[in-house]
Design a protein with these regions (language model features):
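Flexible, low-hydrophobicity surface segments
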Residues: 1-158, 180-183, 265
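General beta-strand structural signal in soluble alpha/beta enzymes
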Residues: 21, 65-69, 105, 181-185, ...
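Acidic, glycine-rich active-site loops and adjacent beta-strand->loop/helix elements
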Residues: 72, 216-219, 242-246, 274-283
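Short acidic, glycine/serine/threonine-rich loops at helix termini
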Residues: 76-82, 124-127, 215, 223-225, ...
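Short Pro/Gly-enriched beta-strand edge/turn motifs at strand-loop
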Residues: 81-85, 175-190, 272-280
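Phosphate/diphosphate-binding loops
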Residues: 109, 115-116, 264-290
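Conserved beta-alpha junction segments in alpha/beta enzyme cores
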Residues: 170-229, 288-289
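Proline/glycine-anchored alpha-helix kink/cap motifs
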Residues: 200-204, 223-235, 258-273
Length: 290
């Protein structure tokens, strides 16, 4: 019996375009009249935000928008995380677009800027004045579980979800074992380390739809973006680009909400690309375990 696929060489249809450098990745895409965005991030892992003054940044010629949490129609969304399995179900968490009241982690987004050039956007970030009150924070998961531990989120407890895994008769297994080894094992978080940092361009089309051309593994984030802006879902369109690496790290929402907010505010196309350092700081990681 002759097979048609197994054992046959199949050409990789995009190989030549990639080796020749002809692929258009997210950051390669530009539009006329495009603005450039930057994100102001918290320099503290835990702090109260006492005041934010954006007046100097807004007064800088060439700056078209400076946004904080008060400018986001729906800044706090409840989101489902995880997958329903036989050992545990999805749990509900908070997706906060921009820090509000306090910051919960180093690098949490505090403000957004859109300007005529990348240099102007960076200068505008320097002019935003944020008054912080540093808080003690908590930096070890076992310490975070103790009664009275500093609450990272809005709840008094740092336990997001709890479930037990039971399989077989452990006591019988121990009784029959020749050797029992007990230890505590820690696995650190792992960065996905893709070559292409997070990037995208957003624009408004003639029908008033916000289009977001973004490096992502999940285009369904248009639903979240629509909720952030308080728009019907058919008013947001997410277009996935050629991906310069993902490995699961671009499954979570990254620049989409920021781009949509700035385009919605200015009416202009907006590009946002993270630096390598910003990508390492800001994007989701593979979870650590104990």
């Amino acid at each position: 019996m002759e097979t048609t696929v197994v054992g046959k060489g199949l050409p990789k249809v995009d190989a030549w375009a990639k080796v020749k450098g002809n692929i258009i990745y997210a950051d390669d895409f530009t539009l006329p009249g495009m603005l450039y965005a930057k994100v102001l991030r918290s320099k503290y892992p835990a702090a109260r935000i006492l005041a934010i003054d954006t007046s100097k940044a807004l007064a800088l010629p060439g700056v078209h928008a400076v946004l904080t949490a008060k400018d986001v129609p729906n800044n706090n969304l409840k989101a489902k995380f995880g997958q329903s399995t036989d050992i545990g179900a999805q749990f509900e968490g908070l997706y906060r677009v921009l820090a509000e009241g306090k910051v919960r982690f180093l690098g949490e987004p505090v403000a957004l800027v859109a300007a005529e050039s990348l240099r102007l956007a960076e200068k505008a970030l320097e002019l935003i004045e944020v008054e912080y009150e540093p808080l003690p924070g908590v930096f070890d998961p076992l310490e975070a579980l103790k009664p009275g531990a500093y609450p990272v989120g809005e709840n008094e407890s740092n336990v997001v979800s709890r479930f037990k895994i039971r399989k077989g008769d452990v006591e019988a297994g121990f009784a029959a074992a020749d050797v029992i080894v007990e230890n505590t094992y820690r696995v650190p978080f792992v960065d996905h380390a893709y070559l292409e940092p997070e990037s995208g361009v957003a624009w408004l089309d003639e029908d008033g739809v916000i289009n977001i051309r973004v490096s992502t593994q999940v285009i369904e984030h248009f639903r979240t973006v629509a909720e952030v802006l308080g728009l019907p879902q058919n008013k947001v369109r997410v277009i996935g680009t050629w991906l310069g690496g993902g490995f699961g790290g671009k499954e979570d929402i990254t620049v989409e909400s920021f781009l949509a907010l700035l385009t919605w505010k200015t009416g202009r196309p907006v590009k946002l690309t993270y630096t390598r350092e910003e990508s390492l700081l800001a994007h989701s990681k593979r979870h650590p375990y104990i």
